[in-house]
Amino acid sequence: MASSSGPISPTSLEMFKPGVEELNPSKLLLLSNHQEGMLYPTILGSLELLSFKRERSLSLQKDKVCLLHQESQLLKLRGTGTDTTDVLLKQPMATSVNCCHDGIFTIWEQDRMLKTSTAPILTESTGSLATRLMSIPRLTLSIGTQVAMRLFRLGFRLARYSLRVTILKAQEGLLLIPDLLRAHPAEPLVQDRAVEPILAIEPPPLV
C-alpha cells in the first residue's frame, strides 16, 4: 500500500464516494502507473496536458530517428572512400522534409518552394496565355457551328429561334467591346483575331 506522502491508493479513494467501482468516469479517472503499480486520481482537464506531453515526446523521438538515419548513411559512404563533407551539408536539408512534417522549413527549402510556386505564373506571362485564349474560342465556335448546322438541317423552328436570340446577344456584346477595351486593355493579338471576323457574321434568317 502507499504511504501518506506517496500516490493515492485505490482504498483511499473511498473518501470521495463510497465504492470505487461506482465512481463516475466523467468526474474522476484512474490512470494506471506501470512503474510503481499504483493508481493516480486524475480530473478532467489534465488529460489534455498528458496528451500534449505524449505528442511532444513522439516528435522528439521522431527527430532522433531522423538523425540516426542520416548518420547511418554517412557511415556507409565513409567506408567507400567517398568525401562526406558535401554530404554533411546537403543531407539534413534533403531529409528534413521527409522526417519532420511540423511546418518547419529551412531557408533553402523556402526558396525552393517559392520557385516552384511562381513557375506557372512566369510561363503564363511569356505568351502561352494569349495562345490559350485564342484556342478556346476556336474550339467553341467549331462545336457551335456543327450543332447549328445540324439544327438548321432538321428544321426545328424553336431551335433556330434560340440560336437567333443567342447570335443577337453576341452582337450586342460586340457593340460593348470598345468600351470594355478602354476600361480593360487587351493584347493586340486578341483584339485583331477575335473581334473582326465575328463582326462579319450575319444572323441566320428565321424561317
UniProtKB/Swiss-Prot annotation:
Outcome after substituting residue 30 to P: In strain: Isolate clinical OC43-Paris
InterPro entries referenced in this protein's UniProt entry, alphabetically: Corona_nucI, N2-like_embe-CoV
Subcellular localization, as worded in the UniProt entry: Virion
Effect of residue 194 to V: In strain: Isolate ATCC VR-759 and Isolate clinical OC43-Paris
GO CC, one annotated term: virion component
Keywords: Virion
Pfam families: Corona_I
Protein origin, superkingdom: Viruses
Family under the similarity heading: Belongs to the coronavirus I protein family.
Role summary: Structural protein that is not essential for the viral replication either in tissue culture or in its natural host.
Other facts noted in the record for this chain: The gene encoding this protein is included within the N gene (alternative ORF).
Name used for this protein in its record: Protein I
